[in-house]
From Swiss-Prot:
Organism: Methylobacillus flagellatus (strain ATCC 51484 / DSM 6875 / VKM B-1610 / KT)
GO molecular function, a single term: proton-transporting ATP synthase activity, rotational mechanism
Protein name: ATP synthase epsilon chain
GO cellular component: plasma membrane; proton-transporting ATP synthase complex
Primary gene name: atpC
Lineage: Bacteria, Pseudomonadati, Pseudomonadota, Betaproteobacteria, Nitrosomonadales
Pfam families: ATP-synt_DE, ATP-synt_DE_N
């Protein structure tokens, strides 16, 4: 029984992570999905949130912000195809707070249907980025 599984996390811009993991937790549309080696095959959509990776061989847990995309689990490999993926330590907290504030302001101003949906999506992404930053703080302290 394998104790690790290969993980590839890629966005449209770059490969964010490629390596062995002991555990991966992803923000699936219907709730968080936890994946250990030998997990059953799976394909699901992911929503904005924190992708948590327990790196193999005693590596520390990594937090990666994912804006959405697809997750595929096959024997021996997990692939995350993300719309946007940013390593937790690369996130800009000030920009995330400002994006959250701007989205909340747009929602308060009773934006039209399309603008309202966009503001909700932007708020969701900003909150997910802030959640990733907070999770990173917890794992480093």
């Amino acid at each position: 029984m394998a104790s690790t599984i290969h993980l590839d996390v890629v966005s449209a811009e770059e490969s964010i992570f490629s390596g062995e993991a002991e555990f991966v937790a992803a923000p699936a549309k219907l709730g968080e999905v936890g994946i250990y080696p030998n997990h059953a095959p799976l394909i699901t959509t992911i929503k904005p949130g924190v992708l948590r990776v327990k790196v193999a061989n005693g590596g520390e847990e990594q937090a990666i912000y994912i804006s959405g995309g697809l997750l595929e689990v096959q024997p021996g490999v997990i692939t995350v195809l993300a719309d946007t993926a940013i390593r937790g330590h690369d996130l800009d907290e000030v920009k995330a707070i400002e994006a959250k504030r701007a989205a909340e302001e747009a929602l308060r101003n009773n934006a039209s249907g399309v603008d309202y949906a966009r503001a909700q999506a932007e708020l969701s992404e900003a909150l997910a980025q802030l959640q990733t930053i907070e999770q990173l703080r917890k794992t480093t302290h």
